[in-house]
Amino acid sequence: MKLHFSFFIWVALIVCSTVMASDKIDEAIDLTQQSFVPVFIRMSDQVIARAGEYEKLCREHSGNPRAQNRKDVIAQLRCKADEAWQKIEKTANALVQNGGIRSIRQFWIVNGFSCLAKPTAIRKFAKRADISFIYLDRFARPSKKPLPMSGNAMTAMKEVLSTWMKKSTRFSGSLRIPWNVREIGAQSVWNEENATGKGIKVAVIDTGIISTPALIHALAKNSEEELNGLDDDGNGLIDDLFGYDFIANNGYILDSAKTTSHGSSCVGIIAGRSSKSGLQTAIAPDSKIMLLKGGFNLHSLEYLMSNGADIVSMSFMIVNRDLGQIRGLFRNAFEHLSLGGVLAVGGAGNYGPKSRRAMPVGKQIGLPKDIPCVLAIAGVDRSRVQLPFSSEGPCYWEGVRFFSDYSKSNSLSKPDLTAFPSGYPVWNISGSHKIRPDWREVEKDKGASLVVGPAGNSFSGPHAAGVAALMLSANPELNPWETSEILRETASDMGSVGTDYKFGAGLIDALAAVRAAKKRN
């Protein structure tokens, strides 16, 4: 009898262990095939492990200056990743040797690693207590080694460096300022509060920029790197002088597009210097820009966090695609990013109920703007009327592993704030005004033009980034969650009283936000 009972317990434990292991594997992974699958293996030891912990840690860290939080959080993240890798490295290397996995890439913004893995290896990893989940990596790209730029690209970048080294037009409040900059309150901030974004670095993940002085003079330069085809600062990247392209894996940060330059328009709204005629598009005209290419690349988040970015402005977003559990991985990363001192912002999207690309309620604002700590910015015209394309909330997180906290009965209120997405000059490729009959060129400058006409909430997001830069130049130690709170508290209410699904907390008020920022300890 004892023998039969022991056997029953043994079988039950095996079954239980198998069930628990399979529960760690993303349901989107097909384990019936024997081919390699792109996966991200999330370790159990995280600074933020599940929903609710970010808010708790924000409260605990609120008494610390942002610089201290950045230092401490990066150290924690790196330490956890290093310790976890030491424990699993032997197993991972053995699986590489026997053909079970390949193309390993380690990360610390979320403690884990990506690889191509066969089902047998996936099942083996799932049995380990130090692994919490195995995601289908829906954003996996072939791994490329850092390589020097092509000859033409190097020549173009040397021209950028040459222009950057020349003295730029000094910022002056007497320059011609577009209506959107004035009406968001930025010009009043410069004149009345003497806050211009000085000392603040904004990372922009986009398409890169046109080679034109007004944008080049806004760039932040990596003082430890030379433009020589080498990795001078020892960070594993070649020629990351003004940022990095994490898709091509090189330092070429110019826009390769031939018709329109999305990145140039966004950078110009945040930090564009004066044109040759004195037209200045920037909200934070003394802030500096770090250029990055490669949305949904965790290494780009690690790079900007460890290289001193205070804010990250993003235009990329995914809607109308089932991302499954991978949403939780990116929420994890952005919560770590925020805890470590970087405010993430971006446009809420152009999928509103009256848009030609309209999406259903609850699906108009996608990853990463649907993440609670990422500010999603909606759009109104100069008359404060909602633009037809502007995406509306709410957002849901029900069923997302570790982060299933916002259901349809308890939804996440989005967008967060509102700004202006069109009707003012933006930097673009010369000749781009010919794309649409209602676009017009207002000025030509070296290598580029200022064009009125391009529209989209991708241009609302940079307004929030620029205003946040003004706030941080007035009070550099504000933490991201404190900056977000002030922006919401000082916004001009629109639509229904209080926060709503069309305008969030309302239209951003730069002057009120900067004054409130100065009063925070």
Model-derived features: positions:
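Subtilisin-like serine protease catalytic core
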Residues: 30-34, 177, 188-296, 307, ...
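Active-site-proximal beta-strand/loop segments in catalytic clefts of secreted hydrolases
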Residues: 43-45, 117, 137, 204-208, ...
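Extracellular S/T/G-rich loop segment that most often corresponds to the catalytic His/Ser-adjacent loop
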Residues: 206, 235, 366-469
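C-terminal subdomain of the subtilisin-like protease fold in secreted/lumenal serine endopeptidases
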Residues: 178, 280, 311-313, 450-451, ...
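Protease zymogen maturation seam
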Residues: 127-201, 211-215, 386-393
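Substrate-binding/access-modulating region of protease and related hydrolase catalytic domains
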Residues: 197-198, 273-277, 290-374, 383-384, ...
